[in-house]
């Protein structure tokens, strides 16, 4: 399991005085980018091919930060399925998501397999 703290910014809040629903995708992306950077030990080159998000609770600017948790569910040849959660610092689940990403070669514009080193680190993340 991987976790990252993400700041709640003033611009994230909408007229209803809570974090706008679209911003949760940004929080998840920030956590996922940090996770991929650690796993790939470099620039995280991936594309999101499927994203399912459930919004569970409000987050307000006064919360200051949220915790993004990434758990690996399935590792394919080029794809990775993760369970991603946005939690308040008090531990309340604000959003949860299931995300499928594909390792991407930007030069050729197509999926590429994970390297052996990446697979080893991802397998470790699956088995914990």
Q: What is the meaning of each model-derived region?
A:
Residues 1-67, 73-128:
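Terminal targeting signals and extreme-terminal segments of soluble enzymes
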């Amino acid at each position: 399991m991987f976790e990252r703290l993400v700041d709640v910014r003033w611009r994230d809040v909408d007229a209803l005085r809570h974090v706008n629903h679209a911003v949760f995708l940004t929080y998840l992306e920030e956590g996922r980018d940090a996770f991929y950077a650690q796993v790939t030990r470099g620039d995280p080159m991936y594309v999101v091919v499927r994203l399912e998000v459930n919004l569970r609770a409000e987050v307000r600017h006064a919360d200051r930060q949220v915790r993004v948790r990434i758990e690996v569910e399935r590792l394919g040849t080029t794809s990775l399925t993760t369970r991603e959660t946005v939690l308040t610092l008090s531990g309340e689940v604000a959003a949860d998501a299931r995300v499928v990403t594909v390792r991407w070669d930007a030069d050729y514009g197509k999926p590429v397999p994970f390297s052996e080193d990446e697979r080893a680190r991802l397998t470790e993340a699956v088995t914990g």
